[in-house]
Amino acid sequence: MEEIVNKVANSALEVFDLEDYYPKGIRSQIDISLWLLEGFLLKEKDFRAHLNNHDWSQYQDQYVAINCSTDAIVPAWASILVSIQLAPFAKKIVNGTIEDLDAALYEKILSEVDYSIYKNKSVILKGCSKKPVPMRAYVLAANYLQDFARSIMYGEACSAVPLFKKK
């Protein structure tokens, strides 16, 4: 009987797993609509009162996204004012969703990776993840890898989709 050989383990493929770069920490979202009259109308005096009475310390060392879940037309200064209140406590603040927050975190992290270790190698951008890796992170990682890798595939070694190959 022939010995079973794990061809994937013996291949020269390098796996780039975005989960390895997922920043640990609590992510929170602040919905400005909760401080609007009926979720739609910003009354400045009431809005500022809500901000003054809010316990900002609960966001200590957290990643925070500020958004408005309704279709309210909110002046730009409202989100800015919330971010100013958050600044002494939060690790990172973005205007948008949790996905926007994760994308911003990945932008910083991926810009600091040394991609030269992938020079002239076949790289698989690992596609299955248990953590919420935003699509923007995959696009950004592929763009960084393209400058170094001989080829880039997406997925798993057993079922990868070719994306790029140097000519």
Name the predicted role of every residue range.
Residues 1-73, 79, 83, 148-151, ...:
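N-terminal, charge-rich interaction modules
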Residues 4, 43-47, 78, 102, ...:
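General structural feature for long, well-ordered alpha-helical segments within catalytic domains
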Residues 51-52, 93, 111, 127, ...:
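A domain-level signal for the structural core that forms small-molecule/cofactor-binding pockets
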Residues 63-69, 94-96, 122-128:
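Short glycine-rich or small-residue beta-strand-to-loop segments that form or flank ligand, phosphate
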Residues 69-76, 128-136, 159:
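Gly/Ser/Thr-rich loops at beta-strand to alpha-helix junctions
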Residues 78-117, 155-160:
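Long, charge-dense
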Residues 81-86, 138-146:
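Short, non-transmembrane amphipathic alpha-helical segments
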Residues 115-139:
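Extended, charge-rich low-complexity interaction segments
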